[in-house]
Curated annotation (Swiss-Prot):
Pfam families: Bac_luciferase
Gene3D superfamilies (UniProt xref): Luciferase-like domain (3.20.20.30)
Name of this chain's protein: Uncharacterized protein YvbT
Lineage summary: Bacteria, Bacillati, Bacillota, Bacilli, Bacillales
Organism: Bacillus subtilis (strain 168)
Gene name of the encoded protein: yvbT
Coiled coil: none
Length: 336
């Protein structure tokens, strides 16, 4: 990839509306709006929210509702789901929700779709999802697309009102090869979760590009890659701030998802060598550092992945540090 091509790589924001230890969900929502407005000023292209359930430290479970809230408080940044876990929902309801959002905020809504539960099995059952729901994802996706663009006579069909005839860009999200291949075969844009599945990143992207078939949506493959970046004014501060993110994943490894914890001086006082290895393996794509470190590592990441767009996740305990992180990332990318 040439420098000119990399210059054109867009930056976007992934937000899980983190709830910090001692904080409130209301504060999380206010911070999410603040970040969206500033991200728009800093030149980020999209702002996506992710569906997760029964996780005390993640407040974006009612994803479509939050998308409407964020879109209503911003002016031009694209807002969408990164993603909606389609097997948790009726395709009809998702078509109606996103048809409504696109009608309210025309030309600004994205519908990113995944097939994972976004939660544990007990919560999945509470969502009325059965254990094999993900296997039906291609059929459910086709059903959803037909609600937006029905084929044939619609007189005797169930219709999505609003939704029918509305152009909502659909993305497929994934952390393995299944969605990569499906996105390629359908000619849809693909977003890969390198921020928690780094080992599968390059193989999945190659599979997507190799299986790509031009469609009425895309003439060429378009790949967005998610990555966690913790940026600060110095390498030392960034490393300190990143310990909140490490603790987040350590809690997941231990099966005890929690609110986002404050940074610590020494992670080795908290995790075992085995846990450290597990977290570091899962977060091996994470970029942590000051401006120059972030710039160099992000350029290498784009060169390796050939990404058309980068979706940045940046979680720190203090909201001001998170805002500064996103500001630094935007600044070094714009001025490289």
């Amino acid at each position: 990839m040439s420098n000119n091509q990399r210059k054109d790589t867009l930056l976007s924001v992934l937000n899980l509306s983190p709830v910090v230890q001692g904080g409130t969900i209301a504060e999380s929502f206010r911070n999410s709006m603040d970040l969206a407005r500033r991200a728009e000023e800093w030149g980020y292209h999209r702002y996506w929210l992710a569906e997760h359930h029964n996780i005390e430290g993640v407040a974006s479970s009612a994803t479509a509702v939050l998308i409407g809230h964020i879109a209503g408080g911003t002016k031009k940044i694209r807002v969408g789901s990164g993603g909606i876990m389609l097997p948790n929902h009726s395709s009809l309801v998702i078509a109606e929700q996103f048809g409504t959002l696109e009608t309210l905020y025309p030309g600004r809504i994205d519908l990113g779709l995944g097939r994972a539960p976004g939660t544990d099995q007990l919560t999945a059952r509470a969502l009325r999802r059965n254990i094999n729901s993900g296997e039906d994802f291609p059929e459910q996706l086709e059903e959803l697309r037909n609600y937006f663009k029905p084929s044939g006579n619609v007189r005797n069909q169930v219709r999505a009102i609003p939704g029918e005839g509305i152009d909502v860009p659909i993305w497929l999200l994934g952390s393995s090869g299944f969605s990569a291949r499906l996105a390629g075969e359908l000619g849809l844009p693909f977003a890969f979760a390198a921020h928690f599945s780094p080992a599968n990143t390059v193989p999945a992207l190659e599979l997507y590009r190799n299986s790509f078939t031009p469609s009425d949506v895309l003439d060429e493959p378009y790949a967005m890659v998610g990555v966690t970046i913790i940026a600060a004014d110095t390498n030392e501060k960034a490393q300190h701030l990143a310990t909140s993110h490490y603790q987040r994943f350590l809690d997941l490894v231990r099966g005890t998802p929690n609110q986002l914890k404050p940074p610590v001086e020494d992670m080795d006082q908290i995790w075992s060598p085995y846990e450290k290895a597990m977290v570091n393996e899962q977060l091996s794509s994470t970029i942590v550092g000051g401006p120059e470190e972030v710039k160099a590592k992000l350029e290498d990441f784009v060169k390796t992945t050939q990404a058309d767009e980068i979706m940045v996740n940046s979680e720190t305990f203090e909201h001001a540090d998170r805002m500064r992180s996103f500001e630094i990332i935007a600044d070094v990318w714009k001025n490289r």
